[in-house]
Curated annotation (Swiss-Prot):
Residues 32-72, 162 are lumenal. It comes from the Eukaryota. InterPro entries: Cornichon, Cornichon_conserved. It is a multi-pass membrane protein. The chain crosses the membrane at residues 11-31, 73-93, 139-161. Belongs to the cornichon family. PANTHER family: CORNICHON-RELATED. This is Protein cornichon homolog 2. It comes from Xenopus tropicalis (Western clawed frog). Regulates the trafficking and gating properties of AMPA-selective glutamate receptors (AMPARs).
Length: 162
C-alpha cells in the first residue's frame, strides 16, 4: 500500500473538516441562543436583565468572531493542498466556498478590524436569519465534503496500491 501526497492531503483534510464541522455547529448553537434570547417576551421589560443580555450578546459575538478567521484559513489550506496535489475535481468543489469566504472577508464593515458579527447588527432579525441560514448551508457543505474526503482517502490509497 503506497502513501501519496494526495492521500496525505485527504487524510489531513478529513481531520480539519471535522474541526470545521464543530466550528459551524457552535455557530448554529450561538445563533439559536441569540434568537431565543431575542424572542423571550417575559424578560424584555426587565431593566436589570437588559444589561446582562447585552453582555451575553457581546460575549457570543466575540466568540463567533474568533472562529471566523481560522475557518477561512483552514478552508484556504484545503484549496492550496488540493491544488498542489493536482486534485482538480476536489479543488473545483471547494473553490465556490473559498470565493464566498474571500468576498465575505473583504466586504466586512469598514469601521473596524472586526470581520463580522457586530453585537448591534446581529440582533437585527434579518441579519440573524441570514447568519443562521449561512451556518446551516456551511454545515451541509462540510458534512458532504467530509464524506467525500473519506471516500477519496480510500479511493486514492486503493488506486495507488493496485
Amino acid at each position: 500500500m503506497a502513501f501519496t501526497f494526495a492521500a496525505f492531503c485527504y487524510m489531513l483534510t478529513l481531520v480539519l473538516c471535522a474541526s470545521l464541522i464543530f466550528f459551524i455547529i457552535w455557530h448554529i448553537i450561538a445563533f439559536d441562543e441569540l434568537r431565543t434570547d431575542f424572542k423571550n417576551p417575559i424578560e424584555q421589560g426587565n431593566p436589570s436583565r437588559a444589561r446582562e443580555r447585552v453582555k451575553n450578546v457581546e460575549r457570543i459575538c466575540c466568540l463567533l468572531r474568533k472562529l471566523v478567521v481560522p475557518e477561512y484559513c483552514i478552508h484556504g489550506l484545503f484549496c492550496l493542498m488540493f491544488m498542489c496535489a493536482a486534485e482538480w475535481v476536489t479543488l473545483g468543489l471547494n473553490i465556490p466556498l473559498l470565493f464566498y469566504h474571500l468576498w465575505r472577508y473583504f466586504h466586512r464593515p469598514a469601521d473596524g478590524s472586526e470581520v463580522m458579527f457586530d453585537p448591534v447588527s446581529i440582533m437585527n432579525v434579518d441579519i440573524l436569519n441570514y447568519c443562521q441560514k449561512e451556518a446551516w448551508c456551511k454545515l451541509a457543505f462540510y458534512l458532504l465534503s467530509f464524506f467525500y474526503y473519506l471516500y477519496r482517502v480510500g479511493a486514492t490509497v486503493r488506486y495507488v496500491s493496485a
